[in-house]
């Protein structure tokens, strides 16, 4: 507005310089013309971006009319009786309560059922989730059973070790009685060498028995061979004895006997 006043003053000043006598006559219409020209500018500025809607003026006029006539609404309300107002209130409540029923009826339509029904992928996903939950429960049960079996096995091992160490659990009095009453005392534990030797001897005896049982002819042949060898060795011994006797006789054929005076040869 200051800009407009400054422009008007400029225009009025120029006209005043040209026509000093007509200044009071031209001042009033010059001020009124720009007001009429720029009176529509606020509505035009507000209408920018509304694609040329000119309803702003009409809406502003209607709002002004409503503000100017507040008595019209009061007159309309005065025309209704309290009974009519109560009936309207009841009807409004009925309409409001019917809305959810209408929504249910719309949802029951076949098209809505088709659109709202779960897809096959969703059904598969639900089934897979259910199966996964069942499998997880099964795995938990299996883990529990495994832990129980491990615990039982460990308990059995501990019990076996305790049974093996029964002597260590006996009381000192029992051990002393056993040592003093029994002369032999505790039997010594067999060494590894004895066990190995016994096992080897047992194997040899088994082999010998098997041979005797399976090959009795072989054993008889061996006995006959021993007898034959013994018979051959006996005559050889006799022959050697005779040879020794002959040698002694030859050597003892003549002997020198020494006396005080001379040697005498004795012939045998």
Swiss-Prot record:
IGT motif, short sequence motif: residues: 44-50
rRNA processing in keyword set: no
InterPro entries with a match to the protein in the record: LAZY
Keywords per UniProt: Growth regulation
Residue stretches of biased makeup (Low complexity): 11-21
Ranges annotated as biased composition (Basic and acidic residues): 30-39, 227-246
Residue numbers spanned by region Disordered: 11-39, 220-246
Tissues where this protein is expressed: Expressed in roots.
GO BP term, example: positive gravitropism
Keyword Lipid biosynthesis: no
Similarity comment: Belongs to the LAZY family.
Further remark: Plants overexpressing DRO1 exhibit increased length and density of roots, and increased biomass of shoots.
PANTHER family in the record: OS03G0406300 PROTEIN (PTHR34045), PROTEIN LAZY 4 (PTHR34045:SF3)
Function: Involved in the development of the root system architecture by influencing lateral root angles and primary root length.
Name of this protein: Protein DEEPER ROOTING 1
Organism in which the protein naturally occurs: Prunus persica
Name of the encoding gene: DRO1
């Amino acid at each position: 507005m200051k800009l407009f006043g400054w422009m008007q003053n400029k225009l009025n000043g120029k006209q005043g310089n040209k026509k000093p006598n007509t200044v009071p006559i031209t001042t009033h219409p010059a001020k009124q013309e720009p007001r009429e020209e720029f009176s529509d500018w606020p509505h035009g500025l507000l209408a920018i971006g509304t694609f040329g809607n000119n309803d702003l003026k009409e809406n502003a006029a209607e709002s002004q009319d409503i503000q100017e006539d507040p008595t019209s609404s009061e007159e309309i309300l005065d025309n209704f009786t309290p009974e009519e107002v109560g009936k309207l209130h009841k009807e409004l409540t009925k309409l409001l309560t019917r809305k959810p029923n209408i929504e249910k009826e719309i949802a029951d339509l076949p098209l809505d059922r088709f659109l709202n029904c779960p897809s096959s992928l969703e059904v598969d996903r639900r089934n897979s989730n259910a199966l996964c939950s069942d499998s997880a429960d099964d795995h938990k049960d299996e883990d529990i059973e495994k832990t129980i079996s491990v615990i039982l096995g460990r308990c059995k091992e501990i019990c076996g070790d305790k049974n093996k160490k029964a002597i260590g659990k006996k009381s000192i009095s029992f051990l002393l009685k056993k040592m003093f009453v029994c002369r032999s005392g505790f039997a010594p534990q067999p060494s590894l060498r004895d066990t190995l030797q016994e096992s080897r001897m047992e194997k040899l005896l088994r082999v010998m028995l098997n041979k005797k049982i399976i090959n009795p002819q072989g054993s008889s042949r061996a006995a006959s061979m021993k007898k034959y060898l013994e018979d051959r060795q006996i005559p050889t011994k006799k022959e050697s004895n005779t040879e020794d006797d002959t040698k002694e006789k030859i050597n003892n054929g003549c002997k020198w006997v020494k006396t005080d005076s001379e040697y005498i040869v004795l012939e045998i």
